[in-house]
UniProtKB/Swiss-Prot annotation:
As an inhibitor of cysteine proteinases, this protein is thought to serve an important physiological role as a local regulator of this enzyme activity. Its main location: secreted. One of its GO terms (cellular component) is multivesicular body. The keyword Protein biosynthesis does not apply. Disulfide bonds join 93-103, 117-137. Keywords: Disulfide bond, Protease inhibitor, Secreted, Signal, Thiol protease inhibitor. The record marks 31 as: Reactive site. The keyword Membrane does not apply. Gene3D superfamilies: 3.10.450.10. Residues 1-20 form the signal peptide. GO terms for molecular function: cysteine-type endopeptidase inhibitor activity; protease binding. This is Cystatin-C. It holds the Pfam family Cystatin.
Length: 140
């Protein structure tokens, strides 16, 4: 009889260790911002919109585009709020050029510019609307 009791105690000990080693996630608050994948479609659309609005409002002769998304978060409200921290870089494309995808970044030190920008974009996907509700940038 000692053998089944030992087996049961061993099994309970293993389960206790496994439970203790499992990472705990705190309770998620409904509607709170959560981390988002920078490659997900909604984030990409929000980023494209933010970069477009950034370039429209810029007095620079050259377009800028995202070098990398440093952090992406989203919040489900009546639509979706996206909070994007983005490293931006100045490209060689002037404002008269429209396709930013193929624009290389300036590599000449006197023309090279980088900025770290935080964008907040409100999107209502089922209506196809976006608005840039807040943004700030600082030189990097």
């Amino acid at each position: 009889m000692a053998s089944p009791l030992r087996s049961l105690l061993f099994l309970l000990a293993v389960l206790a260790v496994a439970w203790a080693a499992t990472p705990k996630q705190g309770p998620r608050m409904l509607g709170a911002p959560e981390e988002a994948d920078a490659n997900e479609e909604g984030v990409r659309r929000a980023l494209d919109f933010a970069v477009s609005e950034y370039n429209k409002g810029s007095n620079d002769a050259y377009h800028s585009r995202a070098i990398q998304v440093v952090r992406a978060r989203k919040q489900l409200v009546a639509g979706v709020n996206y909070f994007l921290d983005v490293e931006m870089g100045r490209t060689t494309c002037t404002k008269s050029q429209t396709n930013l995808t193929d624009c290389p970044f300036h590599d000449q030190p006197h023309l090279m510019r980088k900025a770290l920008c935080s964008f907040q974009i409100y999107s209502v996907p089922w209506k196809g609307t976006h608005s840039l509700t807040k943004f700030s940038c600082k030189n990097a």
